[in-house]
Amino acid sequence: MDLISFKEKDISKKECLELFLDTENFFDILKVADDIRKESVGDTVTYVLNANINFTNVCSGTCKFCAFKTEKEDPNSFFLNPDKVAEKALLARKTGATEVCIQGGLLPEIDTYFQAEILQKVKKITEKYGGIDIHAFSPMEVKSAAENCGLNVKEALKILKDSGLKTMPGTAAEILNDEIRNEICPTKLTTSEWIDVVKTAHKNGIKTTCTMMYGHIEENVHLVEHLSILKEIQKETSGFTEFVPLTFLHENAPLHHIGKVKSGASGILDLKVYAISRIFFKNYLKNIQTSWVKLGIKLSQISLNCGANDVGGTLMEESISKAAGGSFGTCMSEEKLKNMILNVNKIPKKRNTLYELIN
């Protein structure tokens, strides 16, 4: 395998799989990815001042990797109405956040109009403070809410966009293979449905992120299949702003408790995912985000030297990783984020949701 040639060529799915299977050239793969990263985006590492608002942890979903959901009767359950969500968004804006990420569980009472009310109230309450970028609702949430009020996805997305939705998180992707999905999230939208929601969003002016959750029951071939689907969508729509690998946090997940998964990904796989995704995507998808919440600061810093060029955000409130067993905190100050970047000789730059730099 001629790794040097991979710096320039648009590698095939077969070559991508060979990289995942390669056990002899680990550090060489990381170096190739780092060279591509430097050529593509330089030594700038971006971050965003943001807040996560999870408006409910009650969910009818059956995802076997999720430790966040509860039943309505659970004393730890919560459900924030649109006014409460707006209050949290205002607090985030006053604290300096330029982005708020809003997500919640799946319930019959959560329809597109409920989502639109959240957006409208967040937009209105933050307007006199310069507004805030609203990054909200996964493809699964959009589809479920649309079905709850008899709309199709395109109709729902128009209502959400008109109500203030700027971008969407490309979560609920997990692994884009229906055999795997039937095992880990049997009632979630299918691969083709996820693709449809995302493409429809892109074609109607709503950009999204894209994600991949790895380190559970998938095989290397499924990782390649997933990355290939994302790459083909990006070639068609140019609608992804970033790729976010999400390492599976196993400790509190049902998959772990029922014995399907003994542990999550190794540190080697974590770094290979960042490196190989950089080599595979090249300039089709320039921004690859490392997750300090899931990886911790030190491994995230290493990932900045093998493909990643963004460290995500300050978060301010992040409940899902914490519930799953994440042990690296759920909030980081801007100063700490910048130091995390500076300490690996990179240049920190603040950005907004669309990766436009902020002075």
From Swiss-Prot:
What the entry lists under PANTHER family is as follows: FO SYNTHASE (COFH), LIPOYL SYNTHASE 2
Summarize where [4Fe-4S] cluster binds, as residue positions: C59, C63, C66
Sorted alphabetically, which SMART domains does this protein's record hold? Elp3
Q: What is the lineage of its organism?
A: Archaea, Methanobacteriati, Methanobacteriota, Methanomada group, Methanococci
Which family does the record claim for this protein?
A: Belongs to the radical SAM superfamily. CofH family.
Answer whether the UniProt record assigns the keyword rRNA processing to this protein. no
- InterPro entries from the xrefs? Aldolase_TIM, CofH/MnqC-like_C, CofH_family, Elp3/MiaA/NifB-like_rSAM, F420, FO_synthase_su2, rSAM
Q: What is this protein called?
A: 5-amino-6-(D-ribitylamino)uracil--L-tyrosine 4-hydroxyphenyl transferase
Pathway annotation: Cofactor biosynthesis; coenzyme F0 biosynthesis
The chemistry this enzyme catalyses reads: 5-amino-6-(D-ribitylamino)uracil + L-tyrosine + S-adenosyl-L-methionine = 5-amino-5-(4-hydroxybenzyl)-6-(D-ribitylimino)-5,6-dihydrouracil + 2-iminoacetate + 5'-deoxyadenosine + L-methionine + H(+)
* One Pfam family of this chain: Radical_SAM
Q: Which UniProt keywords apply?
A: 4Fe-4S, Iron, Iron-sulfur, Metal-binding, S-adenosyl-L-methionine, Transferase
Functional note? Catalyzes the radical-mediated synthesis of 5-amino-5-(4-hydroxybenzyl)-6-(D-ribitylimino)-5,6-dihydrouracil from 5-amino-6-(D-ribitylamino)uracil and L-tyrosine.
Entry cofactor note text?
A: Binds 1 [4Fe-4S] cluster. The cluster is coordinated with 3 cysteines and an exchangeable S-adenosyl-L-methionine.
Q: Report quaternary structure and partners.
A: Consists of two subunits, CofG and CofH.
Residue intervals of the Radical SAM core domain: 45-282
Q: Which gene encodes it?
A: cofH
Cofactor(s) this protein requires: [4Fe-4S] cluster
Supply the source organism for this entry: Methanococcus vannielii (strain ATCC 35089 / DSM 1224 / JCM 13029 / OCM 148 / SB)
